């Protein structure tokens, strides 16, 4: 069966692994997932990520491995993560109307003509785009 929303699958895997206090989470690799992981690392929500060759483990293609981040007393760095624009209902935002997550404490991941950006980066560049997810 084909996957209709790989971004939602990625976010769900990260959310579930974080709630279960796993150290890392493995998922199929794609360029957009890599860019989302890069943004999550830049914003301090995950500790690191890397791409493994799945053919060594008997799989096909590459896998993305995300190492989750916790505080000194195992507090989760990701309190919540939510998919906004879905295949059935796309959500777009203009540069003048970019969303703020929890009054600026969280981050919105936006797909723009300049690539994937956070809401703050898109505001500085003056570009809008498709609002993929909120992370707080």
Curated annotation (Swiss-Prot):
Role played: One of the primary rRNA binding proteins, it binds directly to 16S rRNA central domain where it helps coordinate assembly of the platform of the 30S subunit.
Single Gene Ontology MF annotation: structural constituent of ribosome
Keyword Magnesium: no
Keyword field: Ribonucleoprotein, Ribosomal protein, RNA-binding, rRNA-binding
GO BP annotations, alphabetical order: translation
Name assigned to this protein: Small ribosomal subunit protein uS8
NCBIfam families associated with the record: PRK00136.1
Protein family: Belongs to the universal ribosomal protein uS8 family.
Subunit-structure text: Part of the 30S ribosomal subunit. Contacts proteins S5 and S12.
Classification lineage: Bacteria, Bacillati, Actinomycetota, Actinomycetes, Frankiales
Pfam families, alphabetized: Ribosomal_S8 (PF00410)
Organism listed in the record: Frankia alni (strain DSM 45986 / CECT 9034 / ACN14a)
One of the record's GO cellular component terms: ribosome
